[in-house]
From Swiss-Prot:
This is Guanine nucleotide-binding protein G(i) subunit alpha-2. SUPFAM superfamilies: P-loop containing nucleoside triphosphate hydrolases, Transducin (alpha subunit), insertion domain. Residues 174-182 are annotated as: G2 motif. Guanine nucleotide-binding proteins (G proteins) are involved as modulators or transducers in various transmembrane signaling systems. The G(i) proteins are involved in hormonal regulation of adenylate cyclase: they inhibit the cyclase in response to beta-adrenergic stimuli. May play a role in cell division. Residues 32-355 form the G-alpha domain. Belongs to the G-alpha family. G(i/o/t/z) subfamily. The gene is Gnai2. Mg(2+) binds at residues 47, 182. GO terms for molecular function: G-protein beta/gamma-subunit complex binding; GTP binding; GTPase activity; metal ion binding.
Length: 355
């Protein structure tokens, strides 16, 4: 009898060992699967981060894929110069050279067909080049916080000669700079540091936010993007609302949401390059009247960081991992994402009882 019990005990111990091994393997597998949700207000740089993941972790854009972005580059360039010229009327800025008024008429006459065909004809590129060189147009561009203008306007317009070539193929950087409003949810998969990432980019405009909710289940981490340079801008969809205030309101609702009690929150204070250019010209008091510091990058950026981190109501149990980013700078994003991944690995292993 004793031998029988001993054999049963041995078999039970083996089974228990096998169950433990399976549980551990399942735990390790779960720890390697990462669901990342990219959130943030419109035009905060979420889609650019997704494009960077393709460049960094998936060998970038092929020549054919780059070619497909040509029409978007043309459209962004045309839309940018049109926005500036339209704003000149509202801001009562005159062309330095009166002949540019004819070019402006030509711009509006030619642009519709060019955008529809995904082209930049020679006559239109000449019109755009002359307009962009005008001092009145440049003065209006300098006041771009007073109207809605694509962040990449100067990037494309300054490089018009290259873009207008008949054999033009967009570079990786050109692709990164393109702006297409995200509607719905864009899912990207990639592997990094033995982790299998599923990244979800959702539209930031108010009308798109109702689509977020079904993405929330089982989220490992949220990357919340904020455009630092938007502190003196209003929303495209609500011209009464400051963009930074809208971002803070949204971050508050995400950071303190009961569904995200155990979710890592990573804060990307993005567009640091544009913010550094702008802060010396446009005071932070536009957004934060109580701000008494200098209009210098380090001090102003730290102040914005503290405003966001102070929204966290569970500081004792929840940490916000903040990074200053420039989403169009591949090296910067690579460095930051490396640090983010280390945090995710540590937190995942902790959750699975393996750390």
């Amino acid at each position: 009898m004793g031998c029988t019990v001993s054999a049963e005990d041995k078999a039970a111990a083996e089974r228990s060992k096998m169950i433990d091994k399976n549980l551990r393997e399942d735990g390790e597998k779960a720890a390697r699967e990462v669901k990342l949700l990219l959130l943030g207000a419109g035009e905060s740089g979420k889609s650019t981060i997704v494009k960077q993941m393709k460049i960094i972790h998936e060998d970038g854009y092929s020549e054919e894929e780059c070619r497909q972005y040509r029409a978007v580059v043309y459209s962004n360039t045309i839309q940018s110069i049109m926005a500036i010229v339209k704003a000149m009327g509202n801001l009562q800025i005159d062309f330095a050279d009166p002949q540019r008024a004819d070019d402006a008429r030509q711009l509006f006459a030619l642009s519709c067909a060019a955008e529809e065909q995904g082209m930049l004809p020679e006559d239109l590129s000449g019109v755009i080049r002359r307009l962009w060189a005008d001092h009145g147009v440049q003065a209006c561009f300098g006041r771009s916080r007073e109207y809605q203008l694509n962040d990449s306007a100067a990037y494309y317009l300054n490089d018009l000669e290259r873009i207008a070539q008949s054999d033009y193929i967009p570079t990786q950087q050109d692709v990164l700079r393109t702006r297409v409003k995200t509607t719905g949810i864009v899912e990207t998969h990639f592997t990094f540091k033995d982790l299998h990432f599923k990244m979800f980019d959702v539209g930031g405009q108010r009308s798109e936010r109702k689509k977020w909710i079904h993405c929330f289940e089982g989220v490992t981490a949220i990357i919340f993007c904020v455009a630092l340079s938007a502190y003196d801008l209003v929303l495209a969809e609500d011209e009464e609302m400051n963009r930074m205030h809208e971002s803070m309101k949204l971050f508050d609702s995400i950071c303190n949401n009961k569904w995200f009690t155990d979710t890592s929150i990573i804060l990307f204070l993005n567009k640091k390059d544009l913010f550094e250019e702008k802060i010396t010209q446009s005071s932070l008091t536009i957004c934060f009247p109580e701000y008494t510091g200098a209009n210098k990058y380090d001090e102003a950026a730290s102040y914005i960081q503290s405003k966001f981190e102070d929204l966290n109501k569970r500081k004792d149990t929840k940490e916000i991992y903040t990074h200053f980013t420039c989403a169009t700078d591949t090296k910067n994003v690579q460095f930051v994402f490396d640090a983010v991944t280390d945090v995710i690995i540590k937190n995942n292993l902790k959750d699975c009882g393996l750390f």
